[in-house]
């Protein structure tokens, strides 16, 4: 799927999610006020609550994800390769560069969060930066940048805030999005084998601590329903 197609699909999914949340909260407010004998005034209160939840959820989700991952701003002096690769990819695509963070973990993994492509954050673990070679790291970073630029990161970030709602994560973070980001990242680097090699290393390495709010964000999350099997992702990349 091309980037513009991903953007359209992710925006539709976001709109559907917002509509569902608004409808659910409005209905809840209405039922409560009817039960209390207050008439239909609760419908307005429910709608107001829904607007607040939807408006603040992406920002809350981003802050929660960075906090739970223990992410700190990436020092360019300490991690120059990280900064240089992201800058190069952003310039090549002509798209915004996210804020860069590093999580102090031996596990090799990465994720992206944000409200939109101009206000996004890319998080990698220390283990990722020390485990992968330059070509492999570029493949992973391109994958995450695709999530950001396709507006997929906004959906996933909303999932951090609202992920406890049954079934909502399947809508916000479908398994298909990983295939799309793999393909988009490979198109950006023009070298699918780099990401293939990275996925193999990540799948066989140490995994980050299992925090339910972050599970759907990681590029590798074995056994999670929001991620397709790594072997299937590799097979798809090898067909490009």
Predicted regions and their residues:
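Short pre-active-site segment immediately N-terminal to the catalytic Zn-binding motif
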Residues: 123-139, 172-175
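Catalytic Zn2+-binding segment of zinc metalloproteases
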Residues: 145-161, 192-193
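Active-site-proximal gating segments in proteases and membrane effectors
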Residues: 92-119, 171-174, 185-240
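Active-site recognition of the HExxH zinc-binding catalytic motif
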Residues: 62, 86, 124, 139-147, ...
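Hydrophobic or amphipathic, alpha-helical segments that drive membrane association/targeting
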Residues: 1-111, 162-171, 175-179, 189, ...
